[in-house]
């Protein structure tokens, strides 16, 4: 049995909608994946994500779960699904992006990356092989290859050197992943064989995605794409964007890269982005997204609405008895006013962050639902124009 099944259902220009099936859920694409860094989407209960918001897939963070509680504990407790009680699909990143953001705390070699934990300063090591082993322990449906993410403004030579390392690491990731899926866990890092966890056979249960790098250099993006596809993966991701480059550069890279990616595999844009970014990336052929913005902004009073972003801390909302977004049908918008949410935030109540994060996730997931419907109807181009024009109303008014 294949670990995932992917079929394109409809197209409108480069935009496409499809069905991604895993062992745990059927996922309609384009899809936004809430980020569950520590095995939880910050401030939001899984019941809400599953029952109200109908999120079919979320992200787990290999770096953070590697450090705490550790793969051995998660393996012993039956994998991240059982440990966290998340019942639907999981995609885990490789840990590469987080490690390479620790510029002053890491040492890069051909073998992998030695770094100091941001928790206690202890020395740790991640390599393609270790990353695959940790993600096997997490038992996610989709595993990401281990890569190096250069800065967005990296020069050509530095980016090319990084790309070549990423290509070698991609092959090592593929080889170790295949060993684990075929033979089970035989590494000294993790002592519990996959076939004994919860009485389930884990062989062949995960899919592996490769990552295309190259910063803003289109020639290198093409080379990375060709080398990654040459290795062969179940899906392909565009990495190394939204890391400081100009937005126009990001859009140029997506527009150049996405249409050249295999048509018969999901296309994933990592770590991006705003609602506008999602719409523009779908327009250029992307299927999958993740970003921390809905919950990160929610914790600081930032709400995404159909007319642009607002900050509930603004004094103008002190007596506003309207919902966060009149066009949103989420439980937060049906029940609570802007004035009440502002009061909660000003009072330092934890509930404020939870409610605004919940709304933001509902907004992102609903946006993707509207995108899918417009593609099916052959109306995505008009939807894109109308959506973006409406989205800029508050931004233009300075709210």
Predicted regions and their residues:
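Non-membrane alpha-helical structural segments and their capping/turn regions in soluble enzymes
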Residues: 125, 129, 156, 160-167, ...
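Non-catalytic, usually N-terminal nucleic-acid engagement modules in DNA/RNA processing proteins
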Residues: 1-184, 201, 315-318
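Conserved, mostly hydrophobic/aromatic
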Residues: 25, 58, 93, 135, ...
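Short acidic/polar active-site loop segments enriched in Thr and Asp
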Residues: 55-56, 141, 234, 287, ...
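Glycine- and acidic
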Residues: 151-156, 160, 235-241, 350-353
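Intrinsic disorder/low-complexity segments
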Residues: 180-204
